[in-house]
């Protein structure tokens, strides 16, 4: 049986001070402020770009494109949040992610609660 110190060690602390279980996230622990903060500091393409381009900016650009095309508010929101799990998990490039089904499972859990 795990002691309390081991259980607490399995949580990540967010920008706002929330404790989030990175394997079994709970909706009440997810805050838009934490998502926005983290994504604004995460670079797209694992940093393999000529200049810093944040995941947050990518999501905003996707949402702007959806608005320009006349898509519904629901689609615009989906564009804003499509990479939200990356605020809690490191992004993996698709060619690697396909070899890590457990990672995909955990990412799907985050997307479900977000």
Q: What do these predicted ranges mean?
A:
Residues 1-114:
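Metal-dependent phosphohydrolase cores
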């Amino acid at each position: 049986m795990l002691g309390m110190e081991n259980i607490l060690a399995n949580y990540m602390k967010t920008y706002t001070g929330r404790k989030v279980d990175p394997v079994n996230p709970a909706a009440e622990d997810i805050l838009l402020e934490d998502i926005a903060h983290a994504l604004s500091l995460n670079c797209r393409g694992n940093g393999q770009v000529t200049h810093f381009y944040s995941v947050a900016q990518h999501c905003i650009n996707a949402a702007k494109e959806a608005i320009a095309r006349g898509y519904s508010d629901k689609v615009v929101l989906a564009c804003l949040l499509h990479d939200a799990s990356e605020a809690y998990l490191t992004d993996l490039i698709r060619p690697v992610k396909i070899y890590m089904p457990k990672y995909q499972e955990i990412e799907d859990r985050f997307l479900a609660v977000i």
